[in-house]
Amino acid sequence: MRLYIIRHADPDYENNTITPEGHLEAKALARRMTREKLHKIYASPMGRAQHTMQYTADALKLKSTTENWTAELETWRADQNKYGVSMIWDVPGEKIRGGEKVPHHHDWHEHDPFNDAKLKQEYEYICAQSDAFLLRHGYERKGHRYRCVKPHQERIAVFCHGGFGLTWLSHLLALPLPMVWSGFWLPPSSVTTVLFDERSKEWAVPRCIGMADCSHLYEAGLPIRPRGIKTNFD
């Protein structure tokens, strides 16, 4: 199975949709995704993800399914006065990596500012929802790998968000959440491809074979917009 994690196009956050530039990105994305021969399409319930997704769904004549658990993590807040950002996934990497010990997969929730019981609980909810979603697609999570219950070669796309997408990737790839947040970025309309790598008939392991790909923007002559990058993008 191939899983495509797609961030929505350039957002109009105030109106929960996408900007005129975002519509151009979504159209270019749809042209690219028609070549991927998708079997199923899913989307966050939020307008900017739905409006991005619709271009691809229309191009492929596929019905989409809304997955509420893939909505953006709008309650995951950081201390604006202390860190200069409002969202927890935007905490500067210099803070995360500045101590003697960096967060690991098993203890990230013990490090400030992530040592909030509610944050850990909400992350575990996303992990549980992810596991249930993938089980419906034939892969059962066992530890950090997936048992092939009903393996297949389908290609499925999930249109979602920057913060959520990185958070989901940390679970799929068994990587420390704060290190993923501070080490990667998903541009608007970018496509991240995760192959469920089946080296045996019993097990599959998620393997990222394409991260934050924006080739459709290059092809269309559109710029990458730095939504989520705080400084010195140019």
Where are these regions (language model features)?
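Acidic, low-complexity terminal tails and accessory targeting/binding regions
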Residues: L73-M87, V91, H144-R155, L166-D234
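Short glycine-rich phosphate-binding loop at a beta-alpha junction
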Residues: H39-P45, R145, R155-V158
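Glycine-rich phosphate-binding loop signature in dinucleotide/nucleotide-binding domains
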Residues: R35-K37, H137, R141, R147-Q153
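Active-site-proximal alpha-helix that buttresses catalytic centers in soluble enzyme cores
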Residues: R2-N68
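Phosphate-handling substructures
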Residues: K61-Y139
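Amphipathic alpha-helical segments that form well-ordered structural scaffolds
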Residues: R32, T52, Y125, Q129-F133, ...
